[in-house]
Amino acid sequence: MEAALTKLDQEEKRALQAYYRCAWEETKNIINDFLEIPEERCTYKLNSYTKKMELLFTPEFHTAWQEVFECREFIINFLRLITGHRVVLKGPAIVFTKETKNLGIPSTINVDFQANIENMDDLQKGNLIGKMNIKEN
C-alpha cells in the first residue's frame, strides 16, 4: 500500500511540474503578447543552481512593468489565475500564498523583480538582465 501511495505521489508531482511548466510558458507568451512589440521581452528558465524558476525580462520591460498600471494588474491577475495562489503586490515584489498538499510546492512563494547588472557585457549586448526569482519562504 505504501509503495502504491509513493508511486501516486510521484505521478502527482510530475503532473504538477508539467502543469507549472505549461503555466510558465503561457505566462511568457501572454506577457510578450500583452506588450504588443515584435521582440521578445520576457522568457523563463529553471535556475540549475537554485532549482527555482525565473522569469527573465529585458531591461526596458524590467524598469517599466510596475509603472504601467494595466500591465502590472494584468500580470498579477494572470499569475493568480494560473497558479491558483493568492497574489499580493508588496512594493517591487509579488507574493503568492497558498496552502498545498505535500507535493513539494512551498506554501509561500516570493517573486522578487530585481535587476542583475553584474555582467556589463550582457548589459551592453542588450541581453536579458531582469529577473523574477521565486524564493521559498
From Swiss-Prot:
Name the record gives this protein: Structural protein A137R
Subunit annotation: Interacts with host TBK1.
Organism of derivation: African swine fever virus (isolate Tick/Malawi/Lil 20-1/1983)
Family the UniProt entry places it in: Belongs to the asfivirus A137R family.
Subcellular location(s) per record: Virion; Host cytoplasm
Keyword Thylakoid carried by entry: no
Regulation: induction: Expressed in the late phase of the viral replicative cycle.
UniProt keyword annotations, A-Z: Host cytoplasm, Late protein, Virion
GO cellular component, one term: virion component
Function as written in the Swiss-Prot or TrEMBL entry: Plays a role in the inhibition of the host innate immune response. Mechanistically, promotes the autophagy-mediated lysosomal degradation of host TBK1 and affects IRF3 nuclear translocation to block type I IFN production.
